[in-house]
């Protein structure tokens, strides 16, 4: 009888950090490799055209069914985003997230993301992972790749438009590529905002060598 056990890694957010998800330099290297595979066409996304971003669960605005979920708050949705990545990876995977604007009142992120990796031949799950940090680092790594190839040589000044979470991971990606940066400038709506203060704290803690 064949072995039918299905074993996979479960990685919570701490596990992901321990595994190196916050290693911005490695994220930039990986995304550079992924973009090369994309350019070669060694990828698949959803749909017949193989380029669908994903499929979204859309809630109705009203329902006669008691307790039925409704589109009654900002950004309320579920989204499934399957893909195949070739090259040395040769894996199928999916990012799945649920989002609800009311989450903030509960002390939760607006969107909560998970990622699954599967054997592309058998469909066996290989890993089920917390993906909020993973997705954020991926987002920041892409402009990191662009800056790596298109920036002036040995840049001294980095300017960020906005102090939010995405620009925090962009900052990490840029700093992983350029140890010449000694000044960080940020343009935001208010220097007194919570996000601006958090960015200031982050820069002082992680990059004490720069002025801002």
Regions found by a protein language model. Give the residues of each.
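Glycine-rich adenosine-cofactor-binding loop
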Residues: 143, 154-178, 187-191
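NAD(P)-binding Rossmann-fold cofactor-contacting core
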Residues: 177-207
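Short acidic-hydrophobic, aromatic-tinged amphipathic segments that line or gate anion-handling sites
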Residues: 211-212
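Alpha-helical scaffold segments in soluble metabolic enzymes
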Residues: 30-33, 142-149, 169, 173, ...
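Structural signal for hydrophobic packing residues in well-ordered secondary-structure cores
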Residues: 35-42, 147, 151, 178, ...
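Short, intrinsically disordered/low-complexity patches at protein termini
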Residues: 117, 149-151, 191-193
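Short, surface-exposed alpha-helical segments at coil->helix boundaries
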Residues: 112, 168, 193-197
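N-terminal ligand-binding/catalytic initiation module
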Residues: 1-138, 142-144, 154
């Amino acid at each position: 009888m064949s072995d039918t056990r299905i074993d996979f890694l479960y990685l919570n957010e701490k596990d992901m950090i321990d595994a190196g998800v916050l290693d911005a330099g490695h994220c930039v290297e990986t995304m550079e490799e992924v973009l090369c595979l994309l350019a070669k066409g060694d990828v698949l996304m959803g749909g017949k055209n193989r380029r669908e971003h994903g499929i979204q669960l859309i809630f109705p605005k009203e329902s006669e069914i008691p307790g039925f979920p409704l589109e009654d708050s900002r950004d309320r949705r579920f989204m499934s985003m399957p893909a195949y990545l070739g090259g040395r990876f040769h894996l199928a995977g999916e990012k799945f997230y649920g989002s609800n604007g009311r989450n903030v009142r509960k002390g939760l992120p607006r969107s909560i993301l998970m990622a699954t990796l599967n054997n592309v031949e058998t469909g066996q799950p290989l890993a089920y992972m917390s993906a909020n940090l993973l997705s954020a680092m991926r987002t920041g790594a892409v402009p990191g790749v662009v800056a790596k190839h298109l920036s002036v040589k040995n840049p001294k000044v980095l300017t960020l438009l906005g102090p939010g979470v995405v620009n925090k991971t962009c900052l990490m990606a840029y700093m992983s590529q350029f140890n010449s940066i000694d000044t960080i400038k940020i343009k935001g709506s208010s220097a007194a905002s919570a996000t601006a203060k958090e960015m200031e704290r982050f820069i002082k803690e992680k990059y004490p060598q720069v002025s801002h």
